[in-house]
Structures are given as C-alpha cells and as structure tokens.
Amino acid sequence: MALSKLFSSACWLNSTVNSPNKPKFAPEQEEEDNYKESALSWIYEKLPTSFVPYAQLVRLDKPTGTWLLYLPCAWSISMASYHANLPLNQTISMLGLFGIGAFVMRGAGCTINDMWDSHIDRMVERTKTRPLASDKITQIEALSFLAIQLSAGLSILTRLNLYSLVAIYPYMKRVTFWPQLFLGFAFNWGALLGWPAMLDSSDFTVTLPLYASGDKKYDKLVDVKSTALLFGSNTRKWLSLFSGAMVSLVALSGYANVQGLPFYLISVAGSTTHLFWIVHKTDFDKAEECGRKFRMSKWTGGVVWLGILVDDIWKRVMM
C-alpha cells in the first residue's frame, strides 16, 4: 500500500516551479488538510470541545490512513483463513481486532509525526491548522495522549509491533530521500502479522509517494527530504515500476497460497487496472488532484481484499 504517499508528495513542488511569482506560503494556497473541508468534519461538531484537538490529532475525519494500515492485515488474515479453511467467526474476530489496532496505531503515528514536525507544520498551508502547529494543545498534552494511545494499542494488539517503524518516519525525512519507504514498512507490516496471528506460523508497499507528492514544494523550501523530490519529473515512471512490482507480488502470493480464479480476476486484474489508472491519469502539477488520488488508493487495497474474500466464499461453496 505504499505508492500513495509518494504520489501525494509530487505536486506542490511542480506548482511552485510553474508559478515563480507566488509567495512561498501564500494564504490562498490552502489545501485539503483544513479540518472543516473534510467530508467527515461533522464528527467534530458532535464531540465535546476539549476532545476536538485530540480527534484532529488522530485525523478522525480522514480514515484513508487507517484503511492503508488495515488492509494489508486483512489480506494476510483472509489468505490464512482461505488456506486453512478456518471458521468464519475466528476470521471475523481477528479482522476486528486488527481493525481496532490499525486505528489506534495510525493515530499514534499521526501524534508522533505532529509532535516532531510542529515547527515545520506552522510554515505549510496544508498543515498549519493541525492542533500542535496551531497551539491548540501543548507538546506535554500530546505526549500524555500518545502514552494513552500506545497503552491502548498494546492491550488490544500485542502482536502488531508498528510503533518502532512509525516513530522513525519523521526522523527519516531529515536524513534520506526515502522516508516513504520506512513509512511503507510501517503501513504494511501487518501483512506479515495477520497470517501468524491466525495460524501460529509464518509461511508484501506502493502508494505512499502519492501522499508525499502533495507536499514536495514545501519539503524543498523547508529542507525536508522525500521520494517525490528525489524522483522529480520521473515520478510517473517510478510509480509505474512500483505498481508493477506490487501486483506481481500479489499474484505471486496468490499462487503460493493456491488461490482460485476469483482472486486473479478481482485481486490481481482489478488492482492492476486501478493502480495504473491512478498513476497515469494524475496531473502531478495539481496538489489537490494528488490528494484525491491518494485517498482513492485505499480502493486498490480494497479490491485485493475483495478478491480474497470472494475466492474464499467460492471455495467454501464449491466444497
């Protein structure tokens, strides 16, 4: 699921290059991170006022990140269920457990990222309204909230060891042009955990650059590194390469798991079509379009999961 972050970081740098007369951080350049612009921003109106900054901190109205973290877990769990013909109640229970864990740990990752980058977020239009950047909460309050998140994550999912990988991402933006690679490891680690969680044995990231593309002009201005800056005008070629690698590995994992025809028709063919449509139809000069395509990337993972589920149902019916 790692192409979406790189894809969303290739756009704003292009708009800066193409519009040299604009101020570096012009007020009119506000982007989709403003909370009131979200389709789910009504959630904040239902919460007590004191809870709102913390809900904003975990991006409660922006579930795409949770989906990108959860779907690799769901693939692995569902493939294990298919492989061993496990009872549906066991599969559903594990899917629910990992779902809660994905929500909690994605929120913890957002908290860590915002704590580390609050001074930079204040200079970027897309992120300047975040709770820490806008001083709605303090670093101490955020740290206390993070402790609660990590405690909840530990009690819910002791096997989902995402903290160490999530925590290192903000630092990687300062030392390497490949921070999305490390974030991709964090988002896809669940693909390695779902199977052993189901079977007590051990027997696959592609869309993160999309997200990074949305911020690349600001990354350059504040000297933060990203794959979008590294790839530059070759972003589409790199994303095509990573997309091909992803769908090839999905197909290979299906072959190794003896998946049936529904898997290849839906998971492989469907995700291939959707990924390459995203990569080749995106205008990297338009930050808002990159943001929309990033949010659509969850459907790539959803298609893969759908194929696994349909294949499992087909197998159970035919047996």
Tell me the role of every PLM-derived stretch:
Residues M1-M319:
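Multi-pass alpha-helical membrane architecture of UbiA-family
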